[in-house]
């Protein structure tokens, strides 16, 4: 009987030898966000030893598995021979002189690309599943079942496996068989309805936030399932879907309707329940300011040199400011237009209220604080030469959460994985390649 992999083996071993759990010291430098190649002996990655069978494409699934990979899991990205992940061709922009899309590069670091025809290579997937801890997929419900790769099929050969399905609408219900994209779920889930100018049409958010949110939900769910597996010694099926993710992300907007019977509307950059809280036009751009408390508002108007507003009953508290929104905002907008973003930033330096210029993407990466965080990492890539990636936003005092390797080329690790993990012979691998079952 195959031994279950246990993410807490090392922890339990320590506990068995000592009542007090002591973290071993090693000479691994504190990389935090910096790219580094850790040694086997000193790898402090929380998910070291966890292997993920990644059958996802596009954004939500790859984002989920990328987060797991940053934390040290070994990610085996299963791709379609010949084309691979559709996002590889989502451009322009492409890296100069290549057909590698910058889109694909953004969510596929720390992974190994293995090309397998799922229909003809089903047995290879079974073999891999037995060596893995987690399987993540984002096919339309029923697709993998038809190939013999659904949860029940995989559970028969790998009962220890955490099987996570990411779908548009779940595996049951009126919409279950529909394909799902971020913007469609954001439309059905109300996000587009509440996004945009007050008098304008519904507006798509600038990045695929529903996809990213589902990827984060899935990553957290997988971590919890791994923790539970260490207690119950078996796997389970996790289901995440875009529509549920989007509706759960409505937070106060949903509560306003469910408990206050209040339909939401578009507010531009304003906040429905807090005033002032918006992006104010300045002499050369926009400056976003949020005064969420009365004390913050009082400091704001002092720094704006508007002492006449301090004792004005129309603005004495947030309830009054919301009621008299238009009058107050017109005053503030007129003042903000008099200076540049740089001038306002100097005036607001050290303030108790939050503020920030509306940056272009160039300005984001030129920002001195962003540079200080070392979020941007540059890695070698066999085709593009260099690739710059935004690294993990979370750091640990002990654990490593890092960029280890650049996004893989299509099928870059197929032979390596089949030989080293599955112990397939060179002859067997060559036959699979000749039959175009793998690439």
Q: Predicted regions: what is each one?
A:
Residues 275-351, 355:
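Aromatic-enriched alpha-helical interface/lid elements that frame and gate functional surfaces
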């Amino acid at each position: 009987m195959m031994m279950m992999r246990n993410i807490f083996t090392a922890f339990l071993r320590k506990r068995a030898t000592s009542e007090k759990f002591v973290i071993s010291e090693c000479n691994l430098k504190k990389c935090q966000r910096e790219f580094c190649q850790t040694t086997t002996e000193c790898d402090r990655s929380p998910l070291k030893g966890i292997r993920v069978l990644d059958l996802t494409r596009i954004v939500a699934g790859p984002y989920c598995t990328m987060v797991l990979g940053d934390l040290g899991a070994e990610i085996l990205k299963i791709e379609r021979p010949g084309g691979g992940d559709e996002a590889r061709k989502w451009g322009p922009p492409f890296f100069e002189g290549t057909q590698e899309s910058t889109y694909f590069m953004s969510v596929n670091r720390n992974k190994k690309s293995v090309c397998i025809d799922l229909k003809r290579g089903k047995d290879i997937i079974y073999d891999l599943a037995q060596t893995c801890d987690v399987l993540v997929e984002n096919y339309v419900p029923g697709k993998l079942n038809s190939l013999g790769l659904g949860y029940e099929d995989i559970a028969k050969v790998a009962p220890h496996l955490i099987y996570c399905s990411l779908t548009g609408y779940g595996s049951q219900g009126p919409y279950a068989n529909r394909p799902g994209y971020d913007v469609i779920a954001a439309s059905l889930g109300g996000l587009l309805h509440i996004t945009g100018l007050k008098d304008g049409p519904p507006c798509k958010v600038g990045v695929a936030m529903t996809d990213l949110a589902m990827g984060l939900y899935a990553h957290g769910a997988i971590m919890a399932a791994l923790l539970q597996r260490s207690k119950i010694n078996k796997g389970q099926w996790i289901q995440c879907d875009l529509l549920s993710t989007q509706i759960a992300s409505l937070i106060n907007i949903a509560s306003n309707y469910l408990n206050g019977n209040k339909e939401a509307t578009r507010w531009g950059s304003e906040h429905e329940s807090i005033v002032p809280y918006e992006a104010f036009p300045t002499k050369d751009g926009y400056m976003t300011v949020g005064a969420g408390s009365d004390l913050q508002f009082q400091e704001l108007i002092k720094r704006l040199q508007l002492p006449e507003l301090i004792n004005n009953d129309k603005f004495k508290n947030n309830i009054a400011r919301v009621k008299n929104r238009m009058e107050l905002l017109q005053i503030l907008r007129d003042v903000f237009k008099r200076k540049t973003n740089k001038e306002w930033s100097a005036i607001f330096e050290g303030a108790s209220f939050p503020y920030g210029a509306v940056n272009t993407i160039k300005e984001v990466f030129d920002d001195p604080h962003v540079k200080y965080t070392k979020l941007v990492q540059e890695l070698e890539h066999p085709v593009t030469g260099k690739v710059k990636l935004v690294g993990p936003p979370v750091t640990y005092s002990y654990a490593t959460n890092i960029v280890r390797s650049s996004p893989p080329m299509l099928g870059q690790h197929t032979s390596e994985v089949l030989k080293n993990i599955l112990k397939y012979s060179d002859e067997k691998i060559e036959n699979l390649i000749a039959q175009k079952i793998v690439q």
